[in-house]
Amino acid sequence: QKKAQVHIKLDTGMNRIGLRTEDEARQVACALAEAKNIKAAGIYTHFAAADEPMEDGSLNAYSRQQLERFKQLRACFDESIPAHVANSAMSLLAPEAYFSMIREGISLYGYPPVKTDLPFAPALTWRSEIVHIKNISRGETVGYGRIFTAPRDMRIATVAVGHGDGYHRAASNRGEMLVQGKR
């Protein structure tokens, strides 16, 4: 009979889901040890602010605190359970967070989550449709955080793609469009 494979989430400070205390961790560890139909295939956490390094480029104090909390809670479980905590930012800032594997995210698309000298380049192309065209005046702003200011009267277009589609807000005002063969 096959066992269901599960990954155990430890809440180290993001305050979403996961085990928060050593008591909770020990209870789950004991239950897993006795379970005949469940196998822990991994144990992990997620960092709330790993992509916000210190000014010198080092890992911020909150992320270090989360990493230490992970190690404390992780100690309640069998050491043979693979651990994975490093997201894209942690993979660049904290090699001590690699454990058994890392979970690259935004980096896979060619966008560095933190400042780096590594040669990142966008690795995908978006295809969408223009859903709205309008004219704006010089000085008007566009987008979240008013990131773009029109340098002159101009015609702009809204494209049907956004954060919900996986388009990262950090790419705002940096991408290029190709419309009817014109960049």
Label the predicted regions.
Residues 2-5, 10-129, 136-137:
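Active-site loop/helix belt of alpha/beta enzymes
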Residues 175-177:
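Short beta-strand elements bearing conserved aromatic residues within extracellular beta-rich modules
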Residues 179-182:
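Helical hairpin unit composed of two closely spaced alpha helices linked by a short loop
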Residues 127-173:
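Functionally critical, mid-to-C-terminal surface segments that flank or help form catalytic/ligand
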